[in-house]
A protein has these predicted regions:
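Alpha/beta enzyme core
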Residues: 2-36, 48-68, 72-190, 198-227
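Short hydrophobic "strand-cap" motifs at the C-terminus of beta-strands
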Residues: 193
């Protein structure tokens, strides 16, 4: 793919999900996102009101996480988290799938968990569309499981499938991103996240089929000129 680092900014979710992230860290993240015109900032729910205020006059979206990082919250809690995040100003939701239900073969429960979050975005009292990304945590899945999870997530109505939380045993891998893209086709986005540190690594993910990158190294990626 022929793209310059600075042109990649619109595909990057500039991320700080560190449990030790401070108010100043989030202010810095938002300032960087505004400067480089990233797609969004991806932050923990506690900081959504702050980010929404800091970014209200620009195109950068506020993205937060639901059921993070294990995906083991009840569906009711995930639905509440989603509505609460949107009430506080979130415009994109990255939810962690119910990995245990999926691994147990409880596929109806698995699907309904995802669909409940999608439905919660439509009843949160906002007029704009809320983007939902489902985190598969691919480090715990084999190829057939990745494919099946993608198929079910697509059928549940998500906007993106996403590789990783960044808290698992490994992050995005080229082969997983490629499989995810082949499975969901062009109707659903693919977000690669976890372990993407520079422009070349981000470009590899785009070449594999990703159209969104989640990274804490967004500034490095978009300023990584090789000319």
């Amino acid at each position: 793919m022929a793209i310059k680092p600075k042109d990649m900014a619109k595909m990057i979710d500039h991320t700080n999900l560190n449990p030790t992230a401070t108010v100043d860290d989030i202010k810095k993240l938002c300032a960087e996102a505004k400067e480089h015109e990233f797609a969004s900032v991806c932050i923990n729910p506690i900081y959504v009101p702050l980010a929404a205020k800091l970014l209200e006059e620009c195109s950068v979206k506020v993205c937060t996480v639901v059921g993070f990082p294990l995906g083991a919250n009840t569906t009711e809690v995930k639905s509440y988290e989603t509505r609460n995040a949107i009430k506080n100003g979130a415009q994109e939701i990255d939810m962690v799938m119910n990995i245990g239900a999926f691994k147990s073969g409880a596929l109806e429960i698995f699907k309904s968990d995802i669909k409940a979050v999608v439905d919660a975005t439509k009843t949160a009292g906002v007029t704009s569309d809320i983007i939902v990304k489902v985190i598969l945590e691919t480090c715990y899945l084999d190829e057939e499981e990745i494919k099946q999870a993608c198929e079910i997530a697509k059928d549940a109505g998500v906007d993106f499938v996403k590789t990783s939380t960044g808290f698992g045993s490994h992050g995005a891998r080229i082969e997983d991103v490629s499989l995810m893209r082949k499975t969901v086709g062009r109707d659903v986005g693919v977000k690669a996240s976890g372990g993407i540190h520079n422009f070349e690594e981000a470009l590899d993910m785009l070449d594999a089929g990703a159209n969104r990158i989640g990274a804490s190294s967004g500034v490095t990626i978009v300023t990584d000129e090789k000319d």
